[in-house]
Amino acid sequence: MSTKPDMIQKCLWLEILMGIFIAGTLSLDCNLLNVHLRRVTWQNLRHLSSMSNSFPVECLRENIAFELPQEFLQYTQPMKRDIKKAFYEMSLQAFNIFSQHTFKYWKERHLKQIQIGLDQQAEYLNQCLEEDKNENEDMKEMKENEMKPSEARVPQLSSLELRRYFHRIDNFLKEKKYSDCAWEIVRVEIRRCLYYFYKFTALFRRK
C-alpha cells in the first residue's frame, strides 16, 4: 500500500536532483548568467503562483506595504554589476525567508524547487561576482578617472535597502507568529519582488 507514496517521493527527489544538475552545469560559464537568472526567476514566479490556489479574502485586513525600494521600481538602466549584486542579495534573503517555518499547506514540491533555485542562483552569482572583481580590479582606477560627472551621480541598486526590505518581511512573519495569513501575504509580496527582478533580466540581456 505504501508503494505509491514511495514512488511519488522518489520522483520528487529525482526532479530536484535534475534541477541541481542543470544549475550546476550552467554555473560553469558566467556568460550564461542571464540565461540562468531569467529561467530560474520565471520558474520561481510560476512556483509561487502554484503554491496556493488563491489569496484568502480573510487575510486582506492583515496586508501591509513592505516598501520595495523605489530604486528597484524605477531603475531602467542599471549596470551589469549592479544587477548581479542585487540578484545575489535577493537570492540570499529570499532563501532565508523560505527556509523558516513555512506555511504547512504549501505544496512541498514547489517550495523545494524555489529553495534549490535560490540557493544555486546565489552560488552562481557569487562565482560571477568574484570573476568580475578579479577581471576589473586593474581597470577600476582608470574607469573612475574617465567617468563623466553626470555618470558619477547615477544611483546604484542598493543591497542595504534590499536587506532592509527583507528584514521588514522577516519581522512581519515573526510578529504574526508565522500565521497562515502572514505566509500568504509574504508569498504574494515576494512574487511581486521577483517580477521586477525578472524585468531586470531583459535589461541585462541588452547590455
Swiss-Prot record:
Cystine bridges: C30-C128, C59-C181
Name the record gives this protein: Interferon kappa
Main location: secreted
High-level lineage: Eukaryota, Metazoa, Chordata, Craniata, Vertebrata
InterPro entries: 4_helix_cytokine-like_core, Interferon_alpha/beta/delta
Coiled-coil boundaries: 118-148
Top-rank taxon, per record: Eukaryota
Keyword annotations of the record: Antiviral defense, Coiled coil, Cytokine, Disulfide bond, Secreted, Signal
